[in-house]
Regions:
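Negatively charged, low-complexity tracts enriched in Asp/Glu with abundant Ser/Thr
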Residues: 2-54, 58-59, 160-229
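Intrinsically disordered, low-complexity segments enriched in small/polar residues
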Residues: 3, 27, 32, 61, ...
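Acidic, low-complexity, intrinsically disordered interaction modules
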Residues: 45-157, 207-217, 221-284
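WW-domain-binding short linear motifs
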Residues: 206-207, 284-309
Length: 309
């Protein structure tokens, strides 16, 4: 059963409509719309704004009002996928803090453009009009964001569940080692019919004509489970391809959500040696990250964990 709900979101308390779908004790809310306009983007960059991102620059196309929420009222549990949160993890200081707290498992290394040495070797001594500025965020928008979960009371969903006032039910627990518990791939076969599907875009950017970076989540609900793939994809032309993937799986009735976090990264040179063709057709494909991912072999980094409800 689908219904429509509205909430107000920063940076200017814009009212957006959420599509709701309920199944087996879970409520799924989603919103997808066009990119933020220049007024909204300016507000995100304004000093003293509560929603300010404090990153060096924003992507060219930013879907800042898009959202996906997975809510279980009986468990007082909300799992949120939010473009603002995704983008905040391009900041070096936030990454370090979350990594030190074991809220994320991986920090992507900085990537440089093909001709970076030309710029780095420019001599600026004696040039008062030129200053080197140390970046505070990742220019490629690589993000180790895993989504964010909390009690319903602490989420943007609290207005829809007024009877839940506190965190007494919710108890955050993560099992870093799943001890052989993995996402059951047989549940993801075509025979397991999809009853609801979302694709929620976060952003797109052409990296000043040096490639492309994008973030999105694809999410599906089957009768007996749900599954999502969130990806931070970066292509720096003639340098490298990087996929940072977070997969989440839940079998209805299970005591936990299974997560798989993996990173694949490979240079253009290695991909070429493996027979991959950087064709114009591939370059224009909306599925280029999936296509090239098949050539990238085993993950550079991978970990499974369990989010207990």
């Amino acid at each position: 059963m689908e219904q429509n709900y509205t909430i107000k979101l920063p940076p200017k308390d814009k009212e957006i409509s959420l599509k709701k779908f309920s199944h087996k004790g879970w409520d799924f809310y989603s919103h997808s719309e066009y990119m933020m306009n220049s007024v909204d983007l300016d507000l995100l960059c304004k000093e003293n704004e509560k929603s300010k991102l404090y990153i060096d620059h924003l992507p060219e196309v930013f879907y800042g009002y898009n959202r996906l929420f997975l809510v279980n009222e009986s468990k007082n549990f909300c799992y949120e996928f939010n473009p603002l949160q995704f983008m905040s993890l391009t900041r070096y200081d936030i990454r370090k803090k979350l990594y030190d707290n074991k809220d994320i498992y991986y920090i992507p290394p900085q990537v440089k453009v093909q001709h970076h040495k030309t710029w780095e070797n420019i001599k600026i001594e004696g040039r008062d009009d030129i200053k080197r500025i140390e970046p505070t965020s990742d220019w490629s928008f690589s993000s180790p964001y895993l989504g964010y979960y909390s009690s319903i009371a602490k989420s943007e969903m609290n207005k829809f569940y007024p009877s839940i006032k506190d965190d007494k039910i919710f108890n955050k627990k993560i099992g870093e080692e799943t001890q052989g518990i993995v996402i059951p791939l047989d549940k993801l076969r075509p025979e397991n019919k999809i009853i609801e599907y979302y694709q929620v875009e976060f952003f797109e950017d052409e990296l000043s004509d040096n490639g492309i970076s994008e973030g999105k989540i694809r999410f599906r609900i089957m009768n007996d489970c749900f599954y999502g793939l969130m990806r931070s994809y970066v292509r720096v032309d003639n340098v490298l391809i990087r996929n940072i993937d977070t997969r989440i799986y839940y079998g209805f009735g299970d005591p936990y959500i299974i997560r798989n976090i993996s990173v694949k990264e490979m240079s253009y040179e290695k991909l070429t040696n493996m027979g991959f063709s950087f064709s114009n057709e591939w370059n224009m494909s909306p599925n280029q990250s999936d296509i090239v991912g098949q050539y990238m072999g085993k993950p550079l980094f991978e970990i499974n964990d369990l989010v207990y409800l």
